[in-house]
């Protein structure tokens, strides 16, 4: 984006990740690419805060669908995440789920702009090769409609530090059929529209 400026760097085993300030009027908005998984994503939240002082994070990306009828063609606004990862337990006391208190802000944005969305729970896991049918069915019974690898951990980091997290997802692969279905995973991973939606959400935040 023209006018963007690199304001910091984070060094990880996979390389150097830039923190980029965007030319957004009247708001201090930046972006960074996070590696997959809660430990890396949550750690980068800590690093970005140390470098920039940022306390509001909009997390967006792809996910697996546990209920393709509910998620097809819609963005997923997460209101709770099942804590099937390790990071969150180092930040807050144990519980099955963690709430996302900002979910209504994201919902209101999609509603106001007539963008298709669904509100629901997600299942955050460290082990994508252990997304078994029995585990999936259990999570579906509890109301989960998606599976991903970051939200529970990142929300725990935000809660511990007194920050705010605004997550939304786009479903890619489909897990609720007879067999795994790649679905729209390629597009969900690479479509730029989520970035531009995140920038618009950033503009309305009180920060």
PLM features per residue range, with description:
Residues 1-100, 104:
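Metabolite-binding pocket within alpha/beta catalytic cores that recognizes anionic/polar moieties
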Residues 6-11, 115-120, 207:
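Flexible, glycine/charged-enriched surface loops at secondary-structure junctions
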Residues 95-143:
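Active-site rim beta-loop-alpha module in soluble metabolic enzymes
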Residues 105-113, 157, 197-205:
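Generic non-transmembrane alpha-helical segments
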Residues 152-187:
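Zn-dependent metallopeptidase/amidohydrolase metal-coordination segment
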Residues 177-207:
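His/Asp/Glu-rich mid-to-C-terminal helical/loop segments that flank catalytic regions of hydrolases
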